[in-house]
Amino acid sequence: MSRVLTLLVASCLLIAGCLEGDEDIFYGDDINPPVAVEDFILVDENGDYFSFSELEGKVIVVAFLFTRCPDICPVVSANMNYVSQELGDLYGTEVAMLSITVDPWRDNSTIMHSYAEQRGLDWPHLTTASEDLSDFTDLSDV
């Protein structure tokens, strides 16, 4: 009797596991049409100029952070790293990541390089002169 009960329970679990579940639920905001951003030049973590036009045609995920941020910025960076890995082949070909400091007075390219390297982040970490950043944030509606 217990053998039949075990087989029945196992069959029910197996069948339940094979049934189709709910579709994935999207919790974000669908931005359609995409927001156009004017071309802008910043400085990357290697001290080289970086132009947004280099990423033309790609979806760009942008995080505004600062390296001395003790709480949410490292979490945002870790989440972006996770997303970049989950994207697989789409990452780099169709989707790009950028991190832009909101503290260019302290976050120069050397500090941005160190921040990215310590966390194993492989996308551009950008900085600029403070007056240029305010121009960019105005254009980006930040």
Regions found by a protein language model. Give the residues of each.
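Secretory targeting signatures
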Residues: 1-23
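N-terminal "domain-start" segment that seeds a small globular fold
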Residues: 22-53, 78
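Envelope-exposed proteins and targeting segments
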Residues: 36-38, 60, 96-98, 140
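Short active-site neighborhood of thiol/selenol oxidoreductases, capturing the structured segment around
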Residues: 50-74, 79-80, 98
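Sec/Tat-exported extracytoplasmic proteins
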Residues: 59, 66, 84-91, 119, ...
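Solvent-exposed, polar/charged alpha-helical surfaces in well-ordered, non-transmembrane soluble domains
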Residues: 67, 74, 78-85, 110-117, ...
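Thiol-based oxidoreductase modules, predominantly thioredoxin-like and allied folds used
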Residues: 92-107, 122-133
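Short, internal strand/loop/helix patches
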Residues: 113-142
